[in-house]
A protein has these predicted regions:
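Long amphipathic alpha-helical coiled-coil segments
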Residues: 175-177
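Regular, well-ordered alpha-helical segments
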Residues: 29, 54, 135-138, 170
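Alpha-helical transition-metal enzyme core signature, strongest for iron centers
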Residues: 24, 52, 126, 158-168
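Basic helix-turn-helix/winged-helix DNA-binding cores
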Residues: 1-95
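Acidic interhelical loop/turn segments
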Residues: 134-154
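Amphipathic alpha-helical dimerization/coiled-coil segments
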Residues: 84-131
Length: 177
């Protein structure tokens, strides 16, 4: 990857910075709130904004923080143009990273009972993520300029959780215990 290339994660950072700007810690917090969308390593939420700023997609300024100065990033015209250009490209399904699907891949090697038990344990995680989505729905009200789009996203994520619940139910029915 060239140092000027924008990745899916780059666009995520530009989108999270949004209209009002954000520090790296804010970006990580926003990504973690829903948990399902925090797919990058923690350090990337600190290094990618710096990289984007060095290439002119973000502007960086220092502000007083709770314990020390913090860097706040805002979109530049180049960053807005990059988002506008990206928005015009066709949407593709990105590769899916799924622990549940990996368990099914190795089921013939490790056995159905252990795979079934592992998949059934997913219910607790589904409940946790679903609760986070409900909290995100409440937070969406505080962002009127994004509320409509956040609600579409959250509805999609609820659907993904529904699919996980269906997978767990099928595993319970079809795999031996």
């Amino acid at each position: 990857m060239s140092t000027d290339e924008l990745t899916l994660f780059s666009y995520e950072i530009l989108g999270l910075v949004g209209r009002d700007g954000a520090g790296a810690h804010d970006l990580l917090r926003m990504a973690r709130q829903g948990r399902v969308l925090a797919w990058a390593g923690e350090s990337q939420y600190y290094t990618e904004p710096k990289r984007l700023a060095s290439h002119g997609y973000l502007a960086a300024r220092t502000e007083p923080g709770k314990t020390r100065a913090r860097t706040v990033y805002t979109l530049t015209e180049r960053g807005r143009e990059a988002l506008a250009e990206y928005a015009r490209t066709p949407v593709r399904i990105t590769p899916i990273k799924s622990d549940a699907l990996l368990r099914l891949l190795i089921c013939d090697l490790v056995g159905e009972p252990v795979t079934r038990d592992a998949l059934v344990s997913l219910r607790e995680d589904i409940a946790d993520v679903r609760q986070r989505l409900v909290e995100s729905e409440r937070r969406a009200e505080a962002l009127p300029h994004r509320e409509k789009y956040l609600r579409l996203t959250l509805a999609h994520l609820h659907g993904l959780l529904d699919l996980h619940e269906q997978l767990v139910a099928r595993a319970e029915d079809e795999l031996t215990s």
